[in-house]
Amino acid sequence: GEGVAASDLALQAARQALDAAGLAPTDLDAILVATISGDYIWPSTACVLQNRLGANNVMAVDLSAACSGFIYGLSVAQAYIASGRYKTILLVGVDMLTKTVDWSDRTSCVLFGDGAGAVILQARDAGKGVIDTVLGADGSAADLLCIPGGGSRMPMTEEVVQKGKHFLHIEGRKIYKHAVKAMAQATLDVLARAGKTLQDGNLMVPH
């Protein structure tokens, strides 16, 4: 809504995750925030969240990977923990995409919303955890889903705004075909790496 920023939603989710884990902000070693619609271009929303939580001097960084941002964050957090660098990490996925869409464009505005989710990841000697992740990217499709204006390629000007270049642009049919193919392949790849098949799973949550 009006006056609400990404860090506001992130803060709510982070506090709920910390409460559920029985932890305080001072117990955190790192904060990762996956977002493409942060409070500012810079500083990072992770830094804003760190300050608002009271997790002073904790490492805080944003990850910009759109819909796959949370999975990228999960993989980065897992690697940090496995390396021994950090033991307790807060990972937040948050976006406020209703502020980036052109509400007169019904092909895009109905697809995007606002929300946040948070998890706490900790080092454990045994038990359940993140088994594996498979990541990939294809920059050749960058122009199919983007916000053209506002970056160093097309700095924000009056003309950019008048042309609507500050709004989210999507070529839905092409993105759909591209995404479904990539998601299916990534699913098969991660199962193969883990020595599993689709029949071994009880739940699959696609996006």
How would you label these PLM feature ranges?
Residues A17, L28-I31, L49, G73, ...:
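Buried hydrophobic positions in well-ordered alpha/beta secondary-structure cores of metabolic enzymes
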Residues A34, S64, I89-D95, G113, ...:
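Short beta-strand segments
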Residues A13-D29, Q185-N202:
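Phosphate/pyrophosphate-binding loops at sites that engage ATP/ADP/AMP, CoA/4′-phosphopantetheine
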Residues G1-G3, D105-K177, K181, Q185-L188:
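Condensing-enzyme catalytic core mediating Claisen C-C bond formation in acyl metabolism
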Residues A82-A116:
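Flexible, glycine-rich active-site loops centered on histidine and acidic residues
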